[in-house]
């Protein structure tokens, strides 16, 4: 099965977050935001990708909103009331309470002050919020019989949540915005190790590693103090809830310690009261310190911060003002900035990220922190198409953003342990850099699609099993007899891969074959130390196909490096691959295009992708035998090859080889070439290790074909089998079930 992901917004961009995820036959919309830097139709996601005829309710099974910031929820009334979506909408209770306030605030600015007409009304906001179903953290919600969702704490702002969505055995985690670092009023994001097929994560600060938070706080307070001491005014653009509470706690405490009560601090009228109310209502969403002190003292009852009245903008003397919105794209913060910017005594501190197109972004890209002289140079900044102002005030960007930095993003990936990662809500170049880091350091597939680009993820599952080695050998023999009407031990070795080409057109497509890898691979330096110049045999995956039937079946790309092998097999780095044998089975149930594929059977998988029509059994062996000297190895190899030519003497000679190996107790680390009989004799000496099934569901037992790949390994502590299931052959399913049931 597959999972499809297409961003309608926030694909290689920050703003109008909206991601459509298809799991099975279910379509989920994660977030429905607007772009704060756009003033035309581009401010909303392009919903025509979902349905050309507007049948959104039939297509979308549910909408999930992660938090109340407008770039994540701002288009929701437009989608429900103007586009006609009438299905379920999920968000946390704090998000449901705060969303309509911010939506109405923005609507007033857009419609009543700017005069725009194609916008939702106040009644539409109310009607939209009536459709919302609130969810609690860690509560599993059944959207329908197939789709379930679960919310996890995201930090970032009050009520922010990451969401885990599951359909059958396929799952996705969508993070929204999150913060892995606790602050003065919120905790850090946290999620179970849910091992989703896909993790969709924000990457606002994909290449940033933040410095000490305490150092940033000192810098913030120092700059404000220096400005107001000289009689200047400080403007701090913020959003109504979230970061501003953090900064208010900080500055209110500092004002008290420094006896600066004669210099007023203001907060946009009405917002302080509303913020206080919501933090009282949803105190359980704050951090432990806030909860513990709330009974004695409400930390949001600020002593030195007062409501701001519009006439105070022209008042003489020093002051500090927190004004909304945070990106200087409209509202009180922009109006005050126009008034204060031409005065070189004043200062504007931008504490967070500003999207492209906003005045805040223009200031950060042209003037931030370059004007730190006592007499800053002026610059001309375009406010809109009709207005340009001269900016003489100091501009500083001190990041107090509640987004995860690069370290936090990697931390969340490790915490959730996904199979694939998709990056959204970030800048393209930075996402590309982080993507390569994730692929290289974590070995996880990573994508960062643009808006409108669909990513398709193959979600075939694996079942790790520990199983008896003796039992495994018997079952392989049983399998070969059951499906090929012949015993495994009766097949001859192939000393030249060209023989496979010669047999392509014969009726051997369903036969089981032994392949002598020693005579059919080139040599590479594996696990090479500076003091070891000896070549070691490499094991390759070879495939025959109708498109490629030339004699040169083995190519450089087929080789697996030692490090990749050890990573795949989860082995210690000291493990050295040695030479062995493989067995192939060509399955009748494969499609015609794959009928000539060479299936490999052996000791451990090599790094080559499986198609969705295959089941993979992956296992490693603990041989624990002593190596011979180089001369003895050659003798053993010759004996083994002779044994292969004379099946009647196979077991005796191999047992002799086995005894010779056991009696030879030296520390030579040269590789040994082993045939299949010798390996199976070694297996028979090992005791069963039992079984430990991590996940096993009846729906998995519908496989089409069995593919077992191999690499001979020298030192492995235990055996791991991974079975990848598909859906068809009931006989093979029954056979595998019987194997599992027979293990004690």
Swiss-Prot record:
Binding site for Zn(2+) 2: 71-72, 177, 425
Keyword tags: Cytoplasm, Hydrolase, Metal-binding, Nucleus, Zinc
CC terms in the record's Gene Ontology section: cytoplasm; INTAC complex; integrator complex; nucleus
Subcellular location: Nucleus; Cytoplasm
Its EC number(s): 3.1.27.-
A biological-process GO annotation: snRNA processing
Entry annotation: catalytic residues: 202
Signal sequence, start to end: none
Disulfide bridge positions per record: none
Motif (HXHXDH motif): 67-72
Main location: nucleus
Spans annotated as Disordered: 626-669
Residues binding Zn(2+) 1: 67, 69, 156, 177
Family to which this protein belongs: Belongs to the metallo-beta-lactamase superfamily. RNA-metabolizing metallo-beta-lactamase-like family. INTS11 subfamily.
Subunit relationships: Component of the Integrator complex. The core complex associates with protein phosphatase 2A subunits, to form the Integrator-PP2A (INTAC) complex.
Listed name of the protein: Integrator complex subunit 11 homolog
Origin organism lineage: Eukaryota, Amoebozoa, Evosea, Eumycetozoa, Dictyostelia
């Amino acid at each position: 099965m597959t999972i499809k992901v297409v961003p309608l917004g926030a694909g290689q961009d920050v703003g109008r977050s909206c991601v459509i995820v298809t799991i099975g036959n279910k379509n989920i919309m994660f977030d429905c935001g607007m772009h704060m830097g756009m003033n035309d139709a581009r401010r909303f996601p392009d919903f025509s990708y979902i349905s050309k005829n507007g049948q959104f309710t039939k297509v979308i099974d549910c909408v999930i909103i992660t938090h109340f910031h407008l770039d994540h929820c701002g288009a929701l009334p437009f989608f429900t009331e103007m586009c006609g979506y009438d299905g379920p909408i999920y968000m946390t209770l704090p998000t449901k309470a705060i969303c309509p306030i911010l939506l109405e605030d923005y609507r007033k600015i857009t419609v009543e002050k700017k005069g725009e007409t194609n916008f939702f009304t106040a009644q539409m906001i109310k009607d939209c919020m009536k459709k919302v179903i609130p969810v609690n953290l860690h509560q599993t919600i059944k959207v329908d019989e197939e789709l379930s969702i679960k919310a996890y704490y995201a930090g970032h702002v009050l009520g922010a949540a990451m969401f885990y969505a599951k359909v059958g055995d396929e799952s996705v985690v969508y993070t929204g915005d999150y913060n892995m670092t606790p602050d003065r009023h919120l905790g850090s994001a946290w999620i179970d190790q849910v091992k989703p097929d896909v993790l969709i994560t924000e990457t606002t600060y994909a290449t940033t590693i933040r410095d000490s938070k305490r150092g940033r706080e000192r810098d913030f307070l120092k700059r404000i103090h220096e400005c107001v001491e000289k009689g200047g005014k400080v403007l701090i653009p913020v959003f109504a809830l979230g970061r501003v509470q953090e900064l208010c706690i900080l500055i209110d405490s500092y004002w008290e310690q420094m006896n600066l009560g004669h210099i007023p601090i203001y907060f946009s009228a009405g917002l302080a009261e509303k913020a206080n109310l919501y933090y009282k209502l949803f105190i359980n969403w704050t951090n432990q310190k806030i909860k513990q002190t709330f009974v004695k003292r409400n930390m949001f009852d600020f002593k030195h911060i007062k409501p701001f009245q519009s006439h105070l903008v022209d008042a003489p003397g020093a002051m500090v003002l927190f004004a909304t919105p945070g990106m200087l794209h409209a509202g009180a913060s922009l109006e005050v900035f126009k008034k204060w910017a031409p005065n070189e005594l004043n200062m504007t501190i931008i504490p967070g990220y500003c999207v492209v197109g906003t005045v805040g972004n223009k200031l950060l890209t042209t003037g931030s922190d370059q004007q730190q002289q006592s007499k800053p140079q002026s610059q001309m900044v375009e406010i809109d198409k009709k207005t340009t102002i001269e900016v003489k005030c100091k501009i500083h960007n001190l990041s107090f953003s509640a987004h995860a930095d690069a370290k936090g993003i990697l931390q969340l990936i490790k915490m959730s342990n996904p199979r694939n990662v998709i990056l959204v809500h970030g800048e393209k170049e930075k996402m590309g850099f982080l993507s390569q880091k994730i692929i290289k350091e974590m070995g996880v597939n990573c994508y960062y699609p643009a808006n409108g680009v669909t990513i398709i993820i193959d979600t075939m599952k694996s079942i790790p099993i520990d199983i008896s080695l003796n039992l495994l050998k018997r079952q392989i023999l049983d399998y070969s007899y059951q499906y090929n009407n012949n015993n495994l031990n009766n097949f001859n070795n192939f000393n030249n891969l060209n023989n496979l080409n010669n047999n392509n057109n014969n009726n051997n497509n369903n036969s089981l074959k032994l392949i002598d890898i020693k005579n059919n691979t080139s040599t590479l330096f594996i696990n090479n130390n500076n003091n070891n110049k000896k070549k070691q045999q490499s094991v390759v995956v070879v495939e025959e196909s109708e498109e490629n039937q030339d004699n040169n079946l083995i190519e450089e790309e087929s080789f697996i490096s030692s490090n990749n092998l050890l990573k795949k097999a989860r082995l210690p780095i000291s493990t050295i691959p040695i030479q062995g044998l493989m067995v192939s089975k060509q399955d009748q149930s494969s499609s015609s295009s794959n009928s000539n594929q060479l299936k490999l059977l052996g000791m451990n998988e090599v790094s080559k992708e499986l198609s969705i029509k295959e089941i993979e059994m992956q296992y490693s062996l603990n041989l624990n035998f002593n190596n011979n000297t180089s001369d003895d190895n050659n003798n053993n190899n010759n004996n083994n090859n002779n044994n292969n030519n004379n099946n009647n003497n196979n077991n005796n000679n191999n047992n002799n080889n086995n005894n010779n190996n056991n009696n030879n107790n030296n520390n030579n680390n040269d590789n040994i070439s082993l045939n299949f009989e010798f390996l199976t004799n070694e297996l028979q000496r090992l005791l069963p290790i039992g079984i430990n099934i991590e996940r096993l569901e009846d729906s998995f037992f519908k496989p089409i074909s069995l593919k077992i790949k191999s690499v001979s390994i020298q030192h492995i502590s235990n055996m791991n089998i991974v079975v990848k299931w598909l859906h068809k052959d009931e006989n093979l399913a029954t056979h595998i079930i019987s194997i599992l049931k027979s293990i004690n």
